[in-house]
Amino acid sequence: MGLPGLGLLLKRFGVLVRVALKVAVGKVLLTLWPSAIRPHLLAMSEKTGMAKNPRFTYEDWAPTFFSTQYFWFVLKVNWQQLEDRTKQGDIAPDSPVVHLSGQRARLWDFMQGNRPLVLNFGSCSUPSFLFKFDQFKRLVEDFSSVADFLTVYIEEAHASDGWAFKNNVDIRRHRDLQERLQAARLLLDRNPGCPVVVDTMENRSSQLYAALPERLYVLQEGRILYKGGPGPWNYHPEEVHAVLEQLCRSSAQSPRL
């Protein structure tokens, strides 16, 4: 059950005030004392992986922080996380998705017996998602014999008409399902090694899994085996590697009937 209407509204208001204060203070510092806030932003970029991404310089992304577009996106992510009800060990939400062919499906359709299913939520405009995509592909290569993988393309993290970075992939907000499918097809050029589906335009999967801007999950037999933290700070394919490796060891040690 979700929060009662009034309780949720109060929590949303609290988040609104907190984010607004953060943006206001950050904007003042960035405008009046840019050299003072630079070390803080650079430290943050180390955690998100932006500092290691050769595609971007500090000037490509730092000036966009604390902008109006930044405010609305951060607020949306925080509001989404308020309603996050997924927990490790709980039943995994069986949300609707769409194949690149346009065929409708549900996440549980991709689960096979007791094989783990790795869910990779993200979008091409999310720098850390693309930067770490090769890590995800290595997961597919290393564990495809024992696990299944699915990339779920969600709404853009840094759309060109939203909170946009310079030198980023130029993709607008998806106005309809066809635009979302078109954006998701760009991932095929990177040879993902697994099926790619898109979230519905109601963003149902993203909401149920609190996946914005990117997130990793491992499901098994209908339950959440691993729940990664929200990206970009906590998007760690290496954690999924450790989970799958442990499963392989446990399976090898299990007595055979």
UniProtKB/Swiss-Prot annotation:
Tissue: Liver specific.
Membrane topology: Single-pass type III membrane protein
Keyword terms: Cell membrane, Endoplasmic reticulum, Membrane, Oxidoreductase, Selenocysteine, Thyroid hormones biosynthesis, Transmembrane, Transmembrane helix
Subcellular location: Cell membrane; Endoplasmic reticulum membrane; Basolateral cell membrane
Any GO BP annotation: hormone biosynthetic process
Top EC class of this enzyme: oxidoreductase
Active site residues per record: U126
InterPro entries: Iodothyronine_deiodinase, Iodothyronine_deiodinase_AS, Iodothyronine_deiodinase_I/III, Thioredoxin-like_sf
Residue intervals annotated with topology Extracellular: 1-12
Source taxon at top rank: Eukaryota
GO (cellular component) term, any one: endoplasmic reticulum membrane
Catalysed reactions, as listed in the record: 3,3',5-triiodo-L-thyronine + iodide + A + H(+) = L-thyroxine + AH2; 3,3',5'-triiodo-L-thyronine + iodide + A + H(+) = L-thyroxine + AH2; 3,3'-diiodo-L-thyronine + iodide + A + H(+) = 3,3',5'-triiodo-L-thyronine + AH2; 3,3'-diiodo-L-thyronine + iodide + A + H(+) = 3,3',5-triiodo-L-thyronine + AH2
GO function term, MF aspect, one: thyroxine 5-deiodinase activity
Subunit structure: Predominantly monomer. Can form homodimers but homodimerization is not essential for enzyme activity.
Function recorded in the entry: Plays a crucial role in the metabolism of thyroid hormones (TH) and has specific roles in TH activation and inactivation by deiodination. Catalyzes the deiodination of L-thyroxine (T4) to 3,5,3'-triiodothyronine (T3) and 3',5'-diiodothyronine (3',5'-T2) to 3'-monoiodothyronine (3'-T1) via outer-ring deiodination (ORD). Catalyzes the deiodination of T4 to 3,3',5'-triiodothyronine (rT3), T3 to 3,3'-diiodothyronine (3,3'-T2), 3,5-diiodothyronine (3,5-T2) to 3-monoiodothyronine (3-T1) and 3,3'-T2 to 3-T1 via inner-ring deiodination (IRD). Catalyzes the deiodination of rT3 to 3,3'-T2 via ORD.
Family, similarity comment: Belongs to the iodothyronine deiodinase family.
Name of the protein described by the UniProt record: Type I iodothyronine deiodinase
Organism the protein comes from: Suncus murinus (Asian house shrew)
